[in-house]
Amino acid sequence: MSNPTKSDGTQWGVMWVAFGGGIIAACHLGKLPPALPLIMRELDAGLVMGGWIASMISFTGFALGLISGTIGDRIGQRFVLVIGLLTIAAGSLIGAFAVSANAMLLSRFIEGIGFSASTVAGAGIITHVTSTKDRKWALGVWSSYVPIGFAGMLIGSALILGISDWRTLWLANAMLTVFWAALAFFVTNGWRRRGARGGGDKLLYNVITCFKQRGACLVAACFAMYAAQHISMMAWLPTYMRETYDASTLLAAAVPAIILLFNAGGNWMSAWAMGRAMPSWCLLFAGALGMGITQLGVFSGSIGEGARLGCALLFGIFGGMIPAAAVGSVAVYTPAPSQIGTMNGLMVMGTNAGMLFGPPAMATVRAGTGAWSEVIWLVASMAGVGVVLSLITRPMERNANSE
């Protein structure tokens, strides 16, 4: 693919603000797990409904991820990033005043629209403002926005919930997001990506062209398998710890936060490896296999607590290898610079598909069997699919690199 940067140099200020926008968006994922039991109790929501509340922010990402990327290619990622962040803030504000489970679902749906828009736009901006030399590293850094934002807000949520209620938490997140939207608006003022033109008929053309890249579609599916396992673990681990170990709210939030920091470490390790010419399929394969093996330990009833914690931390590292590899593959499979946003949208659609069905699937298995150990077969199956998909992409990636 030809160089999509606006200039020969990397525009670091714009890059870091876009990265921060992704972190702020991910905070709205991390605010939920510590508050979910309180929300379920106050809004009279069952376990399965709680799973859908956890996943609803991903529904629109699945449905609109590709469209968000294509629109970003058409009207500019800067505009989409700012509007996306403001939409997240609006959804959080509505959620702060929710009086029923359905109202909370609506607020998470609105947050999902903004999450999809801002994260697709953020990746597109970073791709355009980085030089060829810096791009793989920058995209690897970008892939850590979810674990950093998620982990930070897990701890922040637990602290806020210790002195106030979940509605205050939602309001605080809304204000933080509005602040970053304003910052992004001013810092990116005057930046315009090269080639930001095209007609409405090109939107459909970009979508069709990206879907024709079979390797990219399989990478997105592998990303979905990762996301289903990862978000399920993060969404339900606090509940699991409370039920199994009678953990406090702060401790139940701290352990997932530590796992997420290890996940971010996996992101950066993967970015380092890609910068040294390791193919994406190798990282996808190692990550999927490692996630499957370590989850057997996390949910096993036959090993000690220390060993379970060790498996959970390794789960974070192996899982972190996949997002960086998937995002990095965008530069491999995108046919033209004008389609970067659309291809990023395909990856966002994939990860949100996994985030959508993962938590409800795990909750359904847990509710039906009455034991967390029974979810082993569900997560092992997801990991197995990811392993197979990664192997299938091997020749496709080699062919794409040779073009």
Predicted regions and their residues:
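Juxtamembrane intracellular "pre-TM" segments in multi-pass secondary transporters
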Residues: 2-8, 191-219
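Helix-breaking motifs and short loop linkers at transmembrane-helix boundaries and internal kinks
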Residues: 44, 76, 97-103, 131, ...
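Conserved MFS/SLC helix-loop-helix module at the cytosolic interface between two early adjacent transmembrane helices
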Residues: 63-99
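Helix-to-loop junctions at the C-terminal end of transmembrane segments
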Residues: 65-76, 267-279
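Helix-loop-helix hairpin linking two adjacent transmembrane segments in secondary transporters
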Residues: 132, 141-189
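C-terminal transmembrane helical hairpin of 12-TM major facilitator-type secondary transporters
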Residues: 280-326
